[in-house]
Amino acid sequence: MFYKMIERKCREWFQSEACTVHDLIDYIEKKGQMRDAQIGAIKIYLFLKIACGCRPLAELFQAGTFNAENLDEIELSTRTRQYLAANPAARALFEYSRLENDKGEQVSTNIEGKIKQNPESLDYEDFFQTAFYHISYTDYLFSLPMGAGKTYLMAAFIYLDLYFAQNEPSNPAFAHNFIILAPSGLKSSVIPSLKTIQRFDPSWVIPEPAASDLKRRLSFEVLDQTKTASKSNRTKNPNVQKIANHQPFKKLFGLVAVTNAEKVILDRVKEKDGQIDLFEDSDDEKD
């Protein structure tokens, strides 16, 4: 249900003069290669990235970013109305509690009633922190129906990020490199599917010549190699070698690394003379 508040504010942004990507969305729609569900997700993605600064959802809700209701049109006591007007997190939870699902059922008449009667009784910041798992980093989840083209949507996100990162290299909202985590139990079927990202035509979402330029700059690494034992008691990790080949990392742009979750769990990263150490210590050496 949080999505409804985000989507509502997203529509307002796209209808306003503050939106800076009207031409880009028009281009994507006229190109006619992306499906409606994919375009809808791209709109939300760009809204969160540009209008919301790619901030964590808990922070955005606490700041009242998605608040939209007119308090003067709701039956409230003067005290409650003033409290909600002065506390955006409280107002956000109040608006959330009044949302209705597809069956017309209200999210929570109980929360709405508590806020109306005694708005000071609830810890609004804690509610949103708990709702979004107390994480401090940005974490956006996009859920599409089966067959709607999730892999190509991922590719579109990657190219859109690179497009804006190339124009605004110091803007932290846009990534320069990417890591895709495939479910380990399904890596035999999922990772080959993710390789279709390489075949995605960026001109579906980005005009030329920028699309072709970014396509040339994109590099794709599948980190699926097993460790190899050397003559010593140290183990060489060929996946580390693949990443090390892209040094210097300060200038790295356009790398897409695909792996299963376990492969990114590291005890430490060692460097020697400014280069990544490609060997891992044995269990005895770690002790």
Regions found by a protein language model. Name each.
Residues 1-287:
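RecA-like P-loop NTPase motor core of helicase/translocase proteins
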